[in-house]
A protein has these predicted regions:
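Bacterial N-terminal signal peptides that target proteins for export
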Residues: 1-8
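Bacterial N-terminal signal peptides
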Residues: 8-16
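N-terminal "domain-start" segment that seeds a small globular fold
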Residues: 20-42, 127
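Amphipathic alpha-helical repeat scaffolds
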Residues: 53-57
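Structural microenvironment flanking redox-active thiols in thiol-disulfide oxidoreductases
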Residues: 60-126
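Thiol-/selenol-based redox modules, centered on thioredoxin-like
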Residues: 127-184
Length: 184
């Protein structure tokens, strides 16, 4: 009897944790910044986010430049780009967090938040990416570097863009403009 009670309690707690993530969206997660400091994504409540898995040795690495351009264009309207380096695809992000930061700063002069390297697929997938890739309307594994998730100010994912979608493309910026606060 005690076993069944414990199993029932565990199931309820598991559902509560899932419901909590569903209610809070991406704001339910905490990850480490590139320097190792923990960062609650709840700190970004009220802001529109573009979450991107990145790599320094990929044919799409050049997307760091339009990511920075997008960030500079919209940051004063409550927009953040969050970059998550990942080494899941052909070893294209082999560096340490320090090396990744140095590369992004020197090559692309990035100023948006850069997080510590994580896994975006497989058995060691980070819980944030597990959440992102199992949302019914945006489900599916991350298949390459520079996949993008657009998140509204409440933490809800509103769009997913593939690797080939340039951050400054009309497709992405049009959707971004729809959810950003209007200019006064």
């Amino acid at each position: 009897m005690k076993l069944w009670q414990n199993l029932a309690a565990a199931a309820v707690l598991g559902l509560a944790a899932t419901a909590s993530a569903a209610d809070a969206g991406v704001h339910a997660f905490t990850l480490n910044l590139n320097d190792g400091a923990p960062k609650k994504l709840a700190d970004y409540k009220g802001k529109v986010l573009l979450i991107v898995n990145t790599a320094s040795k990929c044919g799409y690495t050049k997307q760091y430049a339009p990511m920075e351009q997008l960030y500079q264009k919209y940051k004063d309207r409550g927009f953040e780009v969050l970059a998550f380096p990942a080494n899941n695809f052909m070893g294209q992000e082999p560096g340490t967090n320090e090396e990744i930061r140095a590369f992004c700063t020197a090559k692309f002069n990035t100023t948006f938040p850069l997080f510590a390297k994580i896994s975006v697929k497989g058995d060691d997938i980070h819980p944030l990416y597990k959440y992102l890739t199992t949302l019914p309307e945006f489900s599916g594994d991350i298949t390459w570097n520079f996949n993008k998730f657009l998140v509204d100010p409440g933490g809800k994912v509103v769009a997913r863009f593939g690797t080939r979608v340039d951050p400054m493309s009309e497709e992405l910026t049009k959707k971004l403009e729809e959810i950003l606060p209007k200019r006064q």
